[in-house]
Amino acid sequence: MALLQISEPGMAPAPHQRRLAVGIDLGTTNSLVAAVRNSVPEVLPDEAGRVLLPSVVRYLEKGGRRIGHEAKEQAATDPRNTIVSVKRFMGRGKAEVEGAANAPYEFVDAPGMVQIRTIDGVKSPVEVSAEILATLRYRAEDSLGDDLVGAVITVPAYFDDAQRQATKDAARLAGLNVLRLLNEPTAAAIAYGLDNAAEGLYAVYDLGGGTFDLSILKLTKGVFEVLAAGGDSALGGDDFDHALFGHVLAQAGIDAKTLAPEDVRLLLDRVRVLKEALSSAPEAALDVTLSSGAHLVQTISHDTFASLVEPLVQRTLTPTRKALRDAQVTPADIKGVVLVGGATRMPVIRDAVAKYFGQPPLVNLDPDQVVALGAAIQADLLAGNRGTGDDWLLLDVIPLSLGVETMGGLVEKIIPRNSTIPIARAQEFTTFKDGQTAMAIHVVQGERELVADCRSLARFELRGIPPMTAGAARIRVTYQVDADGLLSVFAREQLSGVEASVVVKPSYGLADDDIAKMLEDSFKTAEIDMRARALREAQVEAERMLEATQAALAADGELLETDERAQVDALAAALRAVAQGDDTNAIEAATKALADGTDEFAARRMDKSIKRALSGRRLDEI
């Protein structure tokens, strides 16, 4: 009798049955993948031992592409086809993309999300991000030696619904099952809190390549509660590069509009190196020759750089003050400030943070890796690999208010910002005119009072409202936000019971058909392999059928009449004629025809075998 193994819900019954899940930090500049191995989270390196994957994709002719370090090396020589900092474009229309003026790309003004024309066709940010995620997925599967059950992917806390949905779509294209979208500051807090057994109020200051987040968290006995979140999804280290880029050109008397795309990318790469050098030196030199022959030689001091980027530093402090205000705490209440993101290595940032909070920031964890490590811990837990010490709870928040448009273009907030998720809130509305039988529901996200100043997420209609006098109908609108921060909206007229709903998929220009097509395109090689396998299986079955038929005819051909034998021979010849071809359907059809055509022959052979076996035996011997 077999014994059933019984384990606690959510726990793996045995170590060898551990389900493999990873945490992925999909960054603007670099991306990482991490996993928990032997109860310790660690970042997974590539075959060369490098843990950082540059978030760069270069497109080549005929579907070729380069991803990561190899693509980054060619960014200056092939800037139009080498996409960098794509995270800044996720879920964004062309008008919303800041810094696009200095980007060397040919933008396509598609509805919703901006797209980029390359030598391999027009690419959306979702497709580009999917290439990066797929590369990390392959790295993880190679490192861990098996397929993944899923991944926790981090996003800036201030990403709105459109940007979050775009990230999930990219993961889907990359063949990843998303266990959770986790806010980056929260992931950092998990890694820091579990590593240091920290308790109290903490601020997570997260300045990446393209986004800024500030979260206030309360850590108490394994409970990670986000009290407030603020940020700017269009502010990051790239903006510091552009400030330095503009200064260098101004000093040289060069108009950025006159630069070739190759020179733009070359200069941006060089000023980034210059910026990083200024993190450890009082001054640094720039020496670069442009394609026009112009030779730029400049020395930039740290003081000059600090002066240039001071407005950007102040832009990070504005949402910081707002988050503290929302959490109803002061800088003096904060026990520690955790720095996240490569841009926080700049002394100008560390000095500003220390001055504002009145204490030096915590830097004992690598700011480039801490988010991925926290995501790996959460992924391991969600995959069911609960172990000793994993009794912790994560309470995250929604960063921007969700509301509905009311008469006059006003916004009625249903779920205020910094509400703990998952959450559901409802509010009742009524009709505006006598006899009104339908209501248009416009879902928006933002903090402003006017719809025009907020981001439109979705529209749908509730029809079938019974005709009544204005104000008599009662329409209950329910907003429901899941643990990923994604929204569903339901509307119900209370008297008649008519209802309508929408799962918000923001109109950033990527419909389900588009996603399906991308999936189809991305799996072309796999489909070709599957077709080849199906063809070979059909050929093998055809060969088996022909051999079996030939052997049967040789052994018992006398069981068939002349016309029956001719029919079997004809069916076998027909199968033999197509068996080595490449038409799988034709081979399968001919194989089935021969099988059906020899059914009676097989039955006669069976009868003959039975008679032979029973011949000369008495009934009581059987």
From Swiss-Prot:
GO biological process: iron-sulfur cluster assembly
GO molecular function, one term: ATP hydrolysis activity
Entries under InterPro entries matching the protein: ATPase_NBD (IPR043129), Heat_shock_70_CS (IPR018181), HscA_NBD (IPR042039), HSP70_C_sf (IPR029048), HSP70_peptide-bd_sf (IPR029047), Hsp_70_fam (IPR013126), ISC_FeS_clus_asmbl_HscA (IPR010236)
Keywords: ATP-binding, Chaperone, Nucleotide-binding
PROSITE patterns named in the record: HSP70_1, HSP70_2, HSP70_3
Function: Chaperone involved in the maturation of iron-sulfur cluster-containing proteins. Has a low intrinsic ATPase activity which is markedly stimulated by HscB.
Record's protein name: Chaperone protein HscA homolog
The species this protein was found in: Burkholderia cenocepacia (strain HI2424)
Gene, per the UniProt record: hscA
